[in-house]
Amino acid sequence: MTMMTLFIITLTLVSCDEEQQIAAQLQGHWSGEIRTKYDSFRGVSGGNYYTVFRFNGKPGSRGGHGYEIDYANYRYETRTRIKENFNYSVADEIITITYEGGAIGKIRDYRLDGNTFEGYLDFQNQSIRFRLEKDDQYRDDPYVHGNY
């Protein structure tokens, strides 16, 4: 019985460590193109988006807060920027993003290393393929909609 208890505790601690490690790797800015058509809950739709994700969390945590900025290009006529703040958590190899408006996205089947973050974001009945690169040079844009 004692060995079984130690085994269960060990499995629990390993799982927690992995989730904390994933949350730690997410820290910072990630940017890149999303090439798909979708409608955001603010009404923006289009085919090509340059997207920036910012993840902030405390050391040792399994989540935190951040934001997503979509730079939409409509037939290259105008450039629209929409910012959405969110909270995120890591559990069971899924990154769950809960946006301020209540919408929920789930990132699955992802690969995350020091420079690349790619996978699928399931959001509003769509699966959006993304590939982002670590972007330590990104600076916040004070003129983004939603950044009041």
Name each region found by the language model.
Residues 54, 80-92, 116-148:
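Edge beta-strand at a domain terminus
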